[in-house]
């Protein structure tokens, strides 16, 4: 057994202040009054076996006495090692008693007494005393081996003045009673609702039409939660005029409707707009007249007669009779014809009035022939389709824009006119044989002449400044 002693006052410091890391060293022991004496929060004792493994054992005792003379500590330990148990280290701590006066930050004196006993703790060689597991205190966790560590400590801490001040404020606020701010009202609001306590007004005066606050006649606004002058309120209103106007403006604000392009409402809107401006081919007001097939004249420069289809929402231009100069032939009645598409050909355009005109620009011949019975039923015998197998003679187109008998142009499709009002009569024009008189046209009520030969059609040149839309309108 070997014994040795050491003086802690001459060695490296052991006690540290965790908030002010100023150690107790030899310099601090000389002038203990120059620095405050903090309370030691904890002491960490670490022992490492740096000696020879052949040492049978050892004990050491240490004692320290501070300059203030009020603290004593004693520590005894014995080192035992044997070859049977292996290289192990055993600590035996005796009871440590210390009495001292410690000063806190604010100068208030406190006295701490610690007494504790702990059983022997065996630490195997090679395992660290302090572990690296985060969030756990692993000083002797892995080496206790199921032993119960019992420690008893009693400490009386000193509370800081800041905490005391906060507690005093909370207690004052809880004990302080609030009253209504209306003059003459002494209603205690401690048991009232939080809303009334916050705004310092009782429930009766919050709904009163007129109260006196600070010598002025006021009224409590329900939305502003404060008192306003009586001039800011309307009669029998609990809120001021400004708040009510803002509230009503938000409620009456028109909301913009989002138009869905796939909705039936939008389709109906476009359908109504098209019905007013567009022309429907293939049906009459009575549902009897139907347009027949359309033929083309390949020998006349590639004419192709198709039905006019107006694009949606496209503005149309209507030209009166007084704005244009027309040729000699005029078709009486409201006539709707097919549109002839050929390069710069403007088409057949009826205009406003009772005598719409058929215009042709840039093309000498016109191939529009209208055929129908007097009762409005289509004449299928006289209307030929594109798949017609009838043979026709060679084309002979003269400069006078007339098609002679034996020409190549067959009778073309039927164009039915639809009018805006169902009471107006429907006038259907028919092309006549060259032998018939009367300008080559006949009206409803007359029997249609037989179309044994090719129909005669006369085209008119456009004056040059006409409309270029090529669509028909009825007014």
From Swiss-Prot:
Plastid found in the keyword field: no
Residue ranges of coiled coil: none
Location within or outside the cell: Nucleus
Record remark on domains: The SBP-type zinc finger is required for the binding to DNA.
Primary location group: nucleus
Induction: Negatively regulated by microRNAs miR156b and miR156h.
Tissue and organ distribution: Expressed in young panicles.
GO molecular function: DNA binding; zinc ion binding
Organism: Oryza sativa subsp. japonica (Rice)
Name the record gives this protein: Squamosa promoter-binding-like protein 12
Keyword Transferase: no
Motif Bipartite nuclear localization signal: where in chain: 237-253
Residue stretches of biased makeup (Polar residues): 465-475
Bias-annotated ranges (Low complexity): 51-73
Keyword entries, A-Z: DNA-binding, Metal-binding, Nucleus, Transcription, Transcription regulation, Zinc, Zinc-finger
Function comment: Trans-acting factor that binds specifically to the consensus nucleotide sequence 5'-TNCGTACAA-3'. May be involved in panicle development.
Entries under InterPro entries matching the protein: SBP-like (IPR044817), SBP_dom (IPR004333), SBP_sf (IPR036893)
Entry binding sites for Zn(2+) 2: 221, 224, 228, 240
Recorded name of the encoding gene: SPL12
Residues reported in the UniProt entry to bind Zn(2+) 1: 180, 185, 202, 205
